[in-house]
Amino acid sequence: NIDNAQRQLSGLLGASETLIRLTASTGVQSADTPFIEAVQTAAGKISALFESALARGDISESDLFDRTYAPVPNTDPPQHMTRFTAFTDRVLPAVQEPLLQLDPRVVFCAAVDTNGYLPTHNLKFSQPQGSDPVWNAANSRNRRLFTDRTGLGAARNTEAFLLQTYRRDMGNGTFAMMKDVSAPIYVKGRHWGGFRMGYKVAG
């Protein structure tokens, strides 16, 4: 049945992701290596940015780890605010935006917390919502909770990196085969979330 097929597919995906991680951890270079190294570097930069902000008193640790998602009224798909959203809007674009130029296949790169909440997306995906939810889904992807398998996998992974393959809903009924590579973000030893990069599968 469908449930069994989905479980088997999920198991197969998990096994392939483990194999990819083990291969990369041995130092073998692959087509994915530049993307893996880029997200690991970015995750480290974000960790340092967050820790520096805490040290300066720009944000409190309780606010940075806020997990209360206040719905933004009249948004479809639903958007949410936290006590750290305004802070990440100030500091994350400087890390995220340049990485869009890493390779023509890169579609997005953004930090998510451990629940898949994406506060600050790339500028091109952070348009104000309009009246069309289909357009919003494609163009207003900031302040959203991404709780699908890929989103939560990236958010909760604590290994050095996680490489996943999935079909991304691009809006307007179109999908694209994508790879999602992520690396965990730690703040003073606490797992804050992960840094994700999505790029198109070659061919």
Positions of PLM-derived features:
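N-terminal membrane-sensor/transducer module of prokaryotic signaling receptors
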Residues: N4-G203
